[in-house]
């Protein structure tokens, strides 16, 4: 695997989750461009830098020990990658503090390095939170590969931070630099809310939640076919998002015990808010995690899952396949994984490689609901 070279450090970096013979790199030209641009400014050692949305730690790990750096983002996998890459390169795994995106930073910051996220609502929320947290003369520098850099990103920086200057392209990457200027303090439009009729719920959705403005069509196809009569079963909602699957299931199964996990901190916060609103003080475990990687083996009777098919800008079924493997490990013999997926993804054949029985519970023209029994 090639080293990541920058003016601050040469690093051996890995992605998360790790895959054997992974052809994808844990960095790109936008990471290098951001660090080269920062180095050209010759920042003092006490320069306070906030790094946002660092995919696998390339930015923060490079700056560790060179500047005063804090990292923040919405991905638990990104946090794991930062810690592993710091340790992998001879630095303390905790040498760069990490703050989940749903927590408040403590400025003032002299420089903010931003990897532009796929969800612009997350960028908007982060820019609003930066107001009042920037030192005089501070800059917010956002980087992305040009094919993933929407015009709206610069518009948001202009709106909330100050005048924006776009760089020349370099290795198909571009930077947007906003210099702090007088801007009215903004109120965040997040979280957003929407209502369901069946079950009757109002759901809170923080900025980076998938399908934040309404129920996604896969979940809509899944909800009428959630398992019933579960008794005191131990149930996990794997990749829970705003928690709607687990909450709907819990309302129909009052004695079952639930665990909700997601790698997005904002999804976890949304799920906590929604569980509290719908089910009050009913016991539940909700936390950010690498799926069910930390779940005790053979400790669940049921797993519910609407698996993702992309990680940031990378599309594929590798995350779904890993979640299916995790579910199999966590289920008792005779336990069942229930999933919804696009027909064209061929999940039936993939599940058949892991489980002794796979059946179609329901289907629409676009989606299938499957039950896989261990």
From Swiss-Prot:
One example GO MF annotation? nucleic acid binding
Describe the reaction catalysed, as an equation.
guanosine(1835) in 23S rRNA + S-adenosyl-L-methionine = N(2)-methylguanosine(1835) in 23S rRNA + S-adenosyl-L-homocysteine + H(+)
Q: What is its main location?
A: cytoplasm
Source organism's superkingdom?
A: Bacteria
Matching entries from CDD domains are given as:
AdoMet_MTases
Alphabetized Gene3D superfamilies for the sequence:
Vaccinia Virus protein VP39 (3.40.50.150)
Q: Which Pfam families match?
A: MTS (PF05175)
Give me the Gene Ontology terms describing cellular component: cytoplasm
Which Enzyme Commission number(s) are listed? 2.1.1.174
Q: Which UniProt keywords apply?
A: Cytoplasm, Methyltransferase, rRNA processing, S-adenosyl-L-methionine, Transferase
- Compartment annotation: Cytoplasm
Purpose: Specifically methylates the guanine in position 1835 (m2G1835) of 23S rRNA.
HAMAP family associated with the record: 23SrRNA_methyltr_G
Family classification: Belongs to the methyltransferase superfamily. RlmG family.
Designated name of the protein: Ribosomal RNA large subunit methyltransferase G
State the organism named in the record.
Answer: Pseudomonas entomophila (strain L48)
Classification of source organism: Bacteria, Pseudomonadati, Pseudomonadota, Gammaproteobacteria, Pseudomonadales
């Amino acid at each position: 695997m090639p080293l990541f070279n920058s003016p601050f450090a040469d690093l051996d970096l890995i992605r998360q989750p790790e895959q054997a013979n992974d052809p994808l790199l844990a960095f790109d030209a936008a990471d290098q461009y951001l660090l080269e641009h920062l180095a050209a400014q010759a920042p003092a050692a006490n320069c306070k830098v906030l790094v946002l949305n660092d995919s696998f730690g390339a930015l923060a790990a490079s700056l560790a020990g060179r500047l005063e750096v804090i990292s923040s983002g919405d991905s638990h996998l990104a946090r794991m990658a930062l810690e592993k890459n710091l340790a992998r390169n001879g630095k303390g795994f905790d040498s760069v503090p990490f703050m989940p995106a749903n927590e408040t930073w403590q400025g003032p910051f002299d420089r903010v390095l931003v990897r532009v996220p796929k969800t612009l609502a997350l960028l908007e929320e982060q820019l609003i939170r930066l107001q009042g947290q920037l030192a005089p003369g501070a800059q917010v520098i956002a980087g992305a590969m040009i094919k993933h850099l929407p015009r709206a990103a610069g518009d948001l920086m202009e709106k909330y931070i100050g005048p924006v200057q776009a760089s020349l392209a370099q290795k198909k990457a571009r930077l947007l630099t906003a210099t702090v200027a007088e801007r009215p303090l903004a109120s965040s439009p997040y979280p957003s809310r929407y209502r369901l009729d069946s079950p009757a719920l109002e759901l809170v959705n923080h900025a980076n939640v998938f399908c934040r403005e309404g129920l996604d069509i896969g979940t809509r196809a899944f909800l009428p076919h959630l398992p019933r009569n579960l008794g005191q079963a131990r149930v996990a909602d794997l990749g829970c998002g705003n928690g709607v699957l687990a909450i709907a299931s819990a309302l129909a199964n009052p004695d079952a015990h639930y665990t909700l996990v997601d790698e997005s901190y904002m999804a976890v916060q949304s799920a906590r808010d929604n569980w509290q609103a719908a089910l009050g003080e009913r016991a539940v475990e909700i936390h950010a995690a690498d799926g069910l990687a930390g779940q005790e083996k053979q400790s669940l009777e049921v797993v519910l899952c609407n698996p993702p098919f992309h990680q940031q800008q990378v599309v594929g079924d590798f995350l779904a396949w890993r979640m299916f493997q995790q579910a199999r490990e966590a289920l008792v013999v005779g336990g069942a994984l229930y999933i919804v997926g696009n027909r064209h993804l061929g999940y039936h054949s993939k599940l058949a490689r892991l489980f002794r029985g796979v059946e179609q519970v329901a289907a629409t023209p676009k989606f299938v609901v499957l039950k896989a029994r261990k």
